[in-house]
Amino acid sequence: MNFNKEKYPTLALAETPESLRLLPKESLPELCSELRSYLLDAVSQSSGHFASGLGVIELTLALHYVYKTPFDHLIWDVGHQAYPHKILTGRRDQIDRIRQKNGLHPFPSREESDYDVLSVGHSSTSISAGLGLAVAAEREGLGRKIICVIGDGAITAGMAFEAMNHAGELHSDMLVILNDNDMSISENVGGLNNRFAQLLSGSFYTRLREKGKKAFSAAPPIKALLKRTEEHLKGMVVPSTLFEELGFNYIGPIDGHHIYTLVHMLENMRHLKGPQLLHVVTKKGKGYTPAEKDPIAWHAVPRFDPLSGTLPKTVDSIPTYSNIFGDWLCDTAATDPRLMAITPAMREGSGMVRFSREYPKQYFDVAIAEQHAVTFAAGLAIGGYKPVVAIYSTFLQRAYDQLIHDVAIQNLPVLFAIDRAGLVGADGQTHQGAFDLSFMRCIPNMVIMAPSDENECRQMLHTGYLHPGPAAVRYPRGQGTGVALQPLFPLTIGKSEIKIQGEKIALLCFGTLLSVAREVAIHLNATLVDMRFIKPLDTELILAMASNHSLLVTIEENVIKGGAGSAVNECLMSHKKTVMLLNIGLPDQFIPQGEQNEMRAAYGLDSRGIQKQIQAYCESEM
């Protein structure tokens, strides 16, 4: 993206944090305006996360202005909001390539920049990593500061509270900034609170507080009285002292869009000892009216016209797999009041908006709490209900112990609707659904299904819902194939379906790559099988294919190691069946960002790539 210095004269002077810190404070408001405008121009041309970044323009500038980054360590939780950070840290001219193949990472990435201290993408990891860095900084003894920025959603997760509890115990020097962009904790924002927060962060109050602790440490009753007095004073104008109980010195809330207040506050807090928490209230989408009015719709956007203020409307007649799932939920709930649908803060992405409105008493958004979501489902199942957990493949990783300990061991009837399985596209390595088959396949009692199209997805959801034990249906991001939807009926568990009868080569396909594999089968005169079930496998069919064909090829959008192909390998070995076998899937590496079909082609999972791998394998065996 060509940077227009005439349009952004102040931003041109702030190419790095070092150059930013040379600017006078009086230039910061104009810099905020230019940075916000530049972000709008860049994302509207390239697509990407948008509303979150608009909401932290002032905070990002203030942090890099006050702290000596990258020597001082700045950590962004999740990273949706880090576009302004990337622009200010030497990546301004590359921002139009963010989330694209060979472009900037969609989130902070250690391999991309020294300013990205922690590679992120999942939520609620910042405080734990920050505390580890704080302990390391103490032992280093160079005066390095640690700052973590976490949102009001991410801070509700158990991991964040575990980290804060430990930080309070260790009493290490670190600053946690709570970016409250939903007004979910407090609405007490204004001049009085800004002034009071400045007083609480100032040197006079801090010295008085610390000296008082030392003076009355030998007199517990007086110390307790003073603590209650301090908490009462704070309680008159700030939220509850939950963070104080965890061992943090709480300051705020303050206006996160007043650059001078932020700079002054951070300058005050830079030298405070022990764990500090600064509560900053921001508005997601700040400065762009459409995004302010609907921050959810403008959270992640395609290319759009910033002047029109509208997002391009999709006119696709083929539904997404997420929508297929959401419609199935509604259809099933209409006949079964025992259905309980659970999501860990992914209502829109999982296609559950309609269900949440039509069946609010059967809908549970448990927030960013994947572990709780799974065990909550276990409790519902024990109580006689039929829980359905809608969860992204990458986020199910966070609840692996609960999947085993609380669901599978007890053989409870919990259905997992696993969205974003396989390659997800622009969100890159932290969000690829590459491992679920591998980590679920080894769990006893699990039934695991992978549909080849949207109709089969519905039938598998229905089958899993009726199954008396744990079941999982994994399906990809994006549209189906356009097939007609049939009335619901249960599939025979563990049975596959031959789609094309060929000779010599048998393609055993697990999931939606079946449509691609069909082209290969026709070209090679190969047998094509829709395997449907990863667990239990259709052992009878696999052995028959091994007897009637000279080469078996497994195809899956999961890592090869431990995946569906590995299951076929194990099956053949256990039955002492010798046949040439080629496993096609994702390699043993983390897959970067890029469009889904673009990345499938890059990793040999399009028709051309699959055929090329088969031909190369056959030639090597000749």
Swiss-Prot record:
Cofactor(s) of this protein: Mg(2+); thiamine diphosphate
GO terms of molecular function: 1-deoxy-D-xylulose-5-phosphate synthase activity; magnesium ion binding; thiamine pyrophosphate binding
Presence of keyword Phosphoprotein: no
InterPro entries: Dxylulose-5-P_synthase, THDP-binding, Transketo_C/PFOR_II, Transketolase-like_Pyr-bd, Transketolase_BS, Transketolase_C, Transketolase_CS
UniProt-listed GO biological process terms: 1-deoxy-D-xylulose 5-phosphate biosynthetic process; isopentenyl diphosphate biosynthetic process, methylerythritol 4-phosphate pathway; terpenoid biosynthetic process; thiamine biosynthetic process
Pathway: Metabolic intermediate biosynthesis; 1-deoxy-D-xylulose 5-phosphate biosynthesis; 1-deoxy-D-xylulose 5-phosphate from D-glyceraldehyde 3-phosphate and pyruvate: step 1/1
Disulfide links within the chain: none
Binding site for Mg(2+): D152, N181
Cofactor-binding details, from the entry: Binds 1 Mg(2+) ion per subunit. Binds 1 thiamine pyrophosphate per subunit.
Keyword Ubl conjugation (UniProt): no
Swiss-Prot/TrEMBL catalytic activity: D-glyceraldehyde 3-phosphate + pyruvate + H(+) = 1-deoxy-D-xylulose 5-phosphate + CO2
Keywords attached to this entry: Isoprene biosynthesis, Magnesium, Metal-binding, Thiamine biosynthesis, Thiamine pyrophosphate, Transferase
GO CC aspect terms: cytosol
Gene3D superfamilies named among the record's database cross-references: 3.40.50.920, 3.40.50.970
Entry EC no(s): 2.2.1.7
Pfam assignment, any one: Transket_pyr
Positions bound to thiamine diphosphate: H80, G121, H122, S123, G153, A154, N181, Y288, E370
Assembly information from the UniProt record: Homodimer.
Family: Belongs to the transketolase family. DXPS subfamily.
Its job: Catalyzes the acyloin condensation reaction between C atoms 2 and 3 of pyruvate and glyceraldehyde 3-phosphate to yield 1-deoxy-D-xylulose-5-phosphate (DXP).
Identification of the protein by name: 1-deoxy-D-xylulose-5-phosphate synthase
Organism: Hamiltonella defensa subsp. Acyrthosiphon pisum (strain 5AT)
Lineage: Bacteria, Pseudomonadati, Pseudomonadota, Gammaproteobacteria, Enterobacterales
Gene: dxs
